[in-house]
A protein has these predicted regions:
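Amphipathic alpha-helical assembly/interaction segments
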Residues: 1-109
Length: 109
């Protein structure tokens, strides 16, 4: 499933950023980013096992909310000088693209 694969790719990117935050001893930031990043792919996977279409759509909505949570954290980290603008811009683009794909996928269910 394309949206799941993209979600996994995003989770890996967020995990790598979290590792850099850990090196700066920003453990809470790192853990929050990891959790929200993993939530994206986990909710797509869990929702795909739903017996009912509406339940799957609910999981996809949770997935989108996790994307927005990650995007918010990225913007805060940028403002704090923890991430470069170019990296944040690229990740925000990825989040937006994934959000649109999830929305389109949900509508087709």
């Amino acid at each position: 499933m394309e949206i799941w694969q993209k979600a996994v790719d995003l989770a890996v990117k967020f995990h790598r950023i979290a590792e850099r935050l850990d090196q700066r001893r920003l453990y809470r930031y790192a853990e929050q980013l990891r959790a929200a990043g993993l939530s994206i792919s986990n909710n797509v996977a869990e929702g795909s096992g739903s017996a009912h279409k509406q339940e799957f759509i609910q999981f996809l909505n949770i997935t989108r909310r996790s994307l927005f949570e990650d995007a918010s954290m990225l913007l805060v980290f940028e403002k704090l000088g923890l991430l470069e603008s170019a990296e944040v811009d690229e990740l925000l683009w990825d989040c937006d693209e994934e959000s649109r794909k999830i929305t389109n996928f949900s509508r087709k269910l």
